[in-house]
C-alpha cells in the first residue's frame, strides 16, 4: 500500500477520516500506549520507521503522511491555514482510530504541526517531543527571540528553485548539488553520514507533491527585500511568520512534559540557518541584503527556547537535549543517543 517499501514489522494502511484519506504506518501492539509521529517537510512517515520499531515494549507507533506528502490524499494546502489544517488532519486520524491518551513527536515542520496540535488537544497528550522543530514563529519572516515580523507581508521568503525542479522531475542522482539525494546528505544529516535506507528516504522525498497548492506554494512580488513575499497557497506560506504562530504552546493547560531534541550541527534549523534567506543575505549569497538591523538572520533556536522558557514559567517543564555530531535528523544519525533520551521521556 505504501509507495515506499517499508521495513519488516511496519504495517501500512489507509485511514479514511472525516477530512481526508490518510496513509498511516504503524507497529507494536494495538492495545499499547500510542506514540504519534509527524514528519517534516519534503519527507514522509517513512523517516520514522526505525524509531518506531525501536520503541520499548508496550508502545504502539503510529506515523502519518501529511497531505501532499507520501500516500495521503493530496488535498490543497491553504497558505493562511495550512499548518492548522495539518494538525486537524492528524487529529482526525486519532479520532477515527479511537486512539486514547497518547505521546506525540514532531520533526522539523512536523514540530510546528505538533505545537498547534498541543494547543488544541493538550488534555489528550502524555508527552510532547520536538525534534529539530521549526520555530514557534515559523520559518522565514521573523526576527528576534520574540518572533517579531521583519516586514508586514512576510518577506523574506523563498526556496532554491532548482531543488524544486529536481524534486518534480524525480531526480535520484548525485550530479546536481541541489538534487534531493545531495540535499539529504548535506543538510538532512551531517556529512559524511549516509543513512542505511538512503534510497527509501530519497523515494520518500520524491513523494512530495509539487506546485502552488503544495510545495513550495506561491509567492507574490514585494517591495521588501529580496523582492518576494509568501502568497496564499502551499507550504512555504503556511509556515511563514505571516500565517504561523505557535507561541501559545507556552499557555496550554494541562502541560505535558516537553522534550526538545536537536542535532548540534543542524544547518536547516538554527540561529544561522542555511535555508533562511536573511542568513543567506548576511553571508552574501543573496544580493541586496538590507543589513542586520532591518533583516537579521532568524534566531530559530532562541525563539524556541523563549517559548519553552515561558512554558516553564507558566508551570510546565521541558528538557533540551543536544546530540553532538548530528545534523537535522538525530534520530537517524545517532539513534542510540536519541532513543536513550526519547525512551526516558516516554517512560516519565
Show which residues each predicted segment covers.
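Catalytic histidine-centered segment of alpha/beta-hydrolase-like enzymes
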Residues: 287-295, 326-335
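Conserved HGGG/HGGXW glycine-rich cap/lid loop of the alpha/beta-hydrolase fold
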Residues: 20-79, 93
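Active-site loop/oxyanion-hole signature of alpha/beta-hydrolase fold enzymes
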Residues: 17-18, 63-109, 119-120, 135, ...
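Alpha/beta-hydrolase fold catalytic core
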Residues: 1-35, 56-59, 99-100, 154-158, ...
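Alpha/beta-hydrolase
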Residues: 148-303
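The conserved beta1-alpha1 loop
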Residues: 36-40, 107, 262
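Short glycine-enriched nucleophile-adjacent loop
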Residues: 111-122, 128
Amino acid at each position: 500500500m505504501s509507495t515506499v517499501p517499508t521495513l519488516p514489522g511496519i504495517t501500512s494502511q489507509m485511514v479514511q477520516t472525516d477530512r481526508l484519506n490518510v496513509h498511516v504506518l504503524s507497529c507494536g501492539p494495538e492495545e499499547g500506549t500510542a506514540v504519534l509521529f509527524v514528519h517534516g517537510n519534503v519527507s514522509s512517515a517513512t523517516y520514522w520507521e526505525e524509531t518506531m520499531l525501536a520503541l520499548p515494549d508496550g508502545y504502539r507507533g503510529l506515523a502519518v503522511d501529511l497531505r501532499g506528502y507520501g500516500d495521503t490524499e493530496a488535498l490543497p494546502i491553504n497558505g493562511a491555514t495550512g499548518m492548522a489544517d495539518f494538525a486537524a488532519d492528524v487529529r482526525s486520524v486519532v479520532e477515527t482510530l479511537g486512539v486514547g491518551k497518547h505521546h506525540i513527536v514532531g520533526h522539523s515542520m512536523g514540530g510546528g504541526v505538533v505545537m498547534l496540535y498541543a494547543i488544541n488537544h493538550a488534555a489528550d497528550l502524555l508527552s510532547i517531543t520536538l525534534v529539530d522543530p521549526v520555530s514557534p514563529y515559523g520559518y522565514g519572516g521573523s526576527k528576534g527571540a520574540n518572533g517579531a515580523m521583519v516586514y508586514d507581508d512576510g518577506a523574506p521568503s523563498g526556496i532554491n528553485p532548482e531543488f524544486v525542479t529536481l524534486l518534480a522531475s524525480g531526480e535520484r542522482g548525485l550530479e546536481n548539488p541541489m538534487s534531493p539525494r545531495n540535499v539529504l546528505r548535506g543538510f538532512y544529516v551531517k556529512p559524511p553520514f549516509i543513512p542505511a535506507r538512503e534510497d527509501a528516504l530519497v523515494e520518500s522525498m520524491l513523494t512530495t507533491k509539487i506546485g502552488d497548492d503544495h510545495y513550495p506554494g506561491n509567492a507574490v512580488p514585494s517591495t521588501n527585500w529580496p523582492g518576494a513575499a509568501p502568497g496564499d497557497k502551499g507550504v512555504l506560506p503556511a509556515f511563514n511568520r505571516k500565517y504561523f504562530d505557535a507561541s501559545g504552546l507556552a499557555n496550554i493547560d494541562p502541560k505535558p512534559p516537553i522534550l526538545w531534541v536537536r542535532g548540534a550541527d543542524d544547518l536547516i534549523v538554527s540561529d544561522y540557518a542555511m535555508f533562511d534567506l536573511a542568513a543567506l543575505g548576511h553571508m552574501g549569497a543573496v544580493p541586496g541584503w538590507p543589513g542586520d538591523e532591518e533583516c537579521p538572520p532568524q534566531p530559530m533556536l532562541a525563539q524556541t527556547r523563549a517559548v519553552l522558557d515561558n512554558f516553564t514559567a507558566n508551570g510546565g517543564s521541558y528538557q533540551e537535549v543536544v546530540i553532538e555530531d548530528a545534523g537535522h535528523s538525530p534520530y537517524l544519525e545517532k539513534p542510540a543517543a536519541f532513543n536513550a533520551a526519547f525512551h526516558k521521556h516516554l517512560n516519565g
